[in-house]
Amino acid sequence: MNQFKVDFKEFKQALFTWKYWRMLAVLALGCFTFSSVVNGILIPHHFFAGGLTGLGLLFHDSIKEFIPFSLLYALMNIPIFIIGYREFSLKFIMTSLIGMGLYTGSLRLTEGILISINDPMLAAIFGGVIAGFTTGFYLNLGGSVGGLDIIGTVIKKRLAIPIGTVFNMVNFVVISSNAYLYDLETALYTGIFMYVFSWSMQKGQIGFSQRKSVFIISSKPEEVAENVLK
């Protein structure tokens, strides 16, 4: 109970900061952009995405007549949040729930949207760039939409399996299923989308410039500092 009070206090304090609301604004933009790519590019071209969205698209392909993808994604997140509740702070869980709600709502709002790019290669690249950058932006600010981020972290803690390995295993299943359900060419375009998305997300998260720190250990720090500053 004491820990819950501490976590609740931390979350309550975050709600009254400009930084948190800026993150939510970027998160909302990212969710809307990514859901537009899902409904406007991925579904029409039969591409799959990585992570939980990809698994959701895989299952939704056979039940799309009965349940909208937005509802399916929300249902898939329920057991994930139950598992993650004991592993993460209340602030992270609440932020992820808000993000999941924004993403689910955006998926519903953008249903039926069509981004008119007939060339599948251009569609995969364009979708990957747009979705990747906006996702990277909100991740950089501490945003989350739940999904495999939570599962990957839990598996890493309990089984010592790197998060990247978990994502790679899921993506392998998604691409293989894409090839089985459609054809190899479509699966390759899915792979291209995933690669471009991953690259763009990384750039959106850490930027194009990389900084390096160098530690100099010396018994004559004044002389070293003088020469470095010259």
Q: What is the predicted function of each stretch?
A:
Residues 219-230:
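Short amphipathic alpha-helix segments
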Residues 2-221:
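Core subunits and conserved enzymes of cellular information-processing
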